[in-house]
């Protein structure tokens, strides 16, 4: 069944790019009733999907025109994470109805896979895909799980240390890791059994929030409590840690771009931060809006996207 949609053309109010060094920054305001973007996912065609969490919708932005389309996800929806899958469709961790959701990119038909009975409200967070096309996901209330879209079979496991599973990522080699904010660890998942192997970061109670893999399969972690960005090298079993600039940084999101440069959001600085691992240097891009609250970062070659949930807009950082 086709869902009703709302479309807005915002080309007249798109903010022009602002240049800073080799980066051009451009903001895209979102329409009334379709703001509070939580996560973003960039499609292969360069358009951007985002979760409008407070209105229970999935947004779709065309950066070339500023047009925003809003797709309702149903009564009670409160979408959190979104990722474009290997099928080209946006997949969503839909926390409001405790389900994994797919939106057909052509028809806009919404399909949902509810969590099995007995697991309660999971506070679903983030998802990723393995090399077999299966969806792996986290729930902050203490679970992680796996969905086989072909059959609808879903497995859910209790996380070690209970509450906390947050960000999740797939490495180029196909391994899957997640971070636990409340548990202060990362874990590698066995793709056959679902078992989680805990890996302890060197800083105690660091608050590992989100994770991303670089081209070499190393795991980058944003540490919310400690204000660090850390890197775990699975081949060596070794950690490296860097503190973000400022007195009391709060590292929320982390994303590694196609050149293995690391991007983070720092809530204390109200900024997006770029980290060059080779030079071990940081560059800070403060938002021009107060309390922008970037909760996630994602991108494609040459550009990084930041959803500013506190400013109701999406911001692109493009390499010039």
Describe these PLM feature segments.
Residues 7-15:
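Bacterial N-terminal signal peptides
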Residues 26-29, 69-73, 111-115, 155-159, ...:
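Beta-propeller fold detector
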Residues 48-54, 90-97, 135-141, 177-182, ...:
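Conserved beta-strand positions in repeat-built beta-propeller and related beta-rich domains
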Residues 57-60, 98-102, 142-146, 185-188, ...:
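A short loop-to-beta-strand structural motif that recurs across blades of beta-propeller domains
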